[in-house]
C-alpha cells in the first residue's frame, strides 16, 4: 500500500510540526549531499527553523566562498538589468546590507560550531574541516603559551641572577666594614695599653727591721698580749737593774 499524499499546509500541532521539520530537513540535507557527489555540483543549502535556528550544508569547505560567489553573480546580473543610477545605488546598498548580514550570521554560526554547539546539521566533511581548524588553533595557542612561559622563565632567571649579584656585593661590603671595625678596635686597644701606667715595685724590707718590728713592745704598766708572764717579769727586772748599772758605771768613771 503506497503512502498517501500529504496536504500542503501548515501543521498546527507543534510537536508534529517539529518532528516533520526534523525529518524533512535531514532528507533535504541528504539530497543536497547526494547531488553534489553524483553530479559534481557546487551545492549550498541554508535553512532557518521557525525559532530562527540555522541549518546549512555546503559542498565546499567554507560557506563564505559560495556566498561571495553568489553575491558577485547577483550583483553583475542586476547591474545589467538596472540602467537607472538611482536604482543601482539603492540596489548596491541593499546588496551590501544583505552581504554584511549574511556574513555576521555566518560568523555567529562558526562561533557556535567552535564552541561545540549546533553540530547536528554538519556533515562529516564539515566536521573534519572544523576539527582540523580547531587542531590548528590549538597548536597556535600552545605555541604562544610556551613562548610566554619561556619568556617568563628567562625573566625570572635574570632577576635571580641580579639578586644573587646584589647579595654577593652586600656580603662583601659587610665583610669590609667588619674588617675596618676590627682594625680600629685593635688600634684603640693598643693605644690604651701604651697610655696605661705600670705599677711601681714594692720596697724591699731589711730582715733586721722586720725582726725588730716583729719583737714585742715593752709596756710599763701592763702585760703584752700573747707573752709569757715569766718573760714579762724578766723584762721588768731588766728595766729595774739597768738604771742601777748605769749609775754605778758613772760612779766608777768619776
From Swiss-Prot:
The gene is CAL. CAULIFLOWER may contribute to the shape of the floral meristem. This trait has likely been selected by early farmers during the domestication of modified inflorescence structures. PANTHER family: SERUM RESPONSE FACTOR HOMOLOG. Residues 182-205 are annotated as: Disordered. GO terms for cellular component: nucleus. GO terms for molecular function: DNA-binding transcription factor activity; protein dimerization activity; RNA polymerase II transcription regulatory region sequence-specific DNA binding. It holds the Pfam family SRF-TF. Probable transcription factor that promotes early floral meristem identity in synergy with APETALA1, FRUITFULL and LEAFY. Is required subsequently for the transition of an inflorescence meristem into a floral meristem. Seems to be partially redundant to the function of APETALA1. InterPro entries: MADS-box/MEF2_TF, MEF2-like_N, TF_Kbox, TF_MADSbox, TF_MADSbox_sf. Its main location: nucleus. GO terms for biological process: cell differentiation; flower development; positive regulation of transcription by RNA polymerase II. This is Transcription factor CAULIFLOWER. Homodimer capable of binding to CArG-box sequences. Residues 182-191 have a biased composition (Polar residues). It comes from Brassica rapa subsp. rapa. Keywords: Activator, Coiled coil, Developmental protein, Differentiation, DNA-binding, Flowering, Nucleus, Transcription, Transcription regulation. The lineage of its organism: Eukaryota, Viridiplantae, Streptophyta, Embryophyta, Tracheophyta. Residues 1-61 form the MADS-box domain. It is found in: Nucleus. Residues 90-180 form the K-box domain. SMART domains: MADS.
Amino acid at each position: 500500500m503506497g503512502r498517501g499524499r500529504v496536504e500542503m499546509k501548515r501543521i498546527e500541532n507543534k510537536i508534529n510540526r517539529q518532528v516533520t521539520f526534523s525529518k524533512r530537513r535531514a532528507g533535504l540535507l541528504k539530497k543536497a549531499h547526494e547531488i553534489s557527489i553524483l553530479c559534481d555540483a557546487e551545492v549550498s543549502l541554508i535553512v532557518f527553523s521557525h525559532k530562527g535556528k540555522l541549518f546549512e550544508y555546503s559542498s565546499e569547505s567554507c560557506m563564505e566562498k559560495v556566498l561571495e560567489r553568489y553575491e558577485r553573480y547577483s550583483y553583475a546580473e542586476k547591474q545589467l538589468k538596472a540602467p537607472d543610477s538611482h536604482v543601482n545605488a539603492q540596489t548596491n546598498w541593499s546588496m551590501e546590507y544583505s552581504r554584511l548580514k549574511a556574513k555576521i550570521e555566518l560568523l555567529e554560526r562558526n562561533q557556535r560550531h567552535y564552541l561545540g554547539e549546533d553540530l547536528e546539521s554538519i556533515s562529516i566533511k564539515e566536521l573534519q574541516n572544523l576539527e582540523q581548524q580547531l587542531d590548528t588553533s590549538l597548536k597556535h595557542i600552545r605555541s604562544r603559551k610556551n613562548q610566554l612561559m619561556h619568556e617568563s622563565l628567562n625573566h625570572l632567571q635574570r632577576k635571580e641572577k641580579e639578586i644573587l649579584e646584589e647579595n654577593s656585593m652586600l656580603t662583601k661590603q659587610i665583610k669590609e666594614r667588619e674588617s675596618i671595625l676590627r682594625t680600629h678596635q685593635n688600634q684603640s686597644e693598643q693605644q690604651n695599653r701604651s697610655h696605661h701606667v705600670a705599677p711601681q715595685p714594692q720596697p724591699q724590707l731589711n730582715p733586721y727591721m722586720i725582726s725588730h718590728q716583729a719583737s714585742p713592745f715593752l709596756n710599763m704598766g701592763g702585760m703584752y698580749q700573747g707573752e709569757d708572764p715569766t718573760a714579762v717579769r724578766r723584762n721588768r727586772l731588766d728595766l729595774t737593774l739597768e738604771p742601777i748599772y748605769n749609775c754605778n758605771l758613772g760612779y766608777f768613771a768619776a
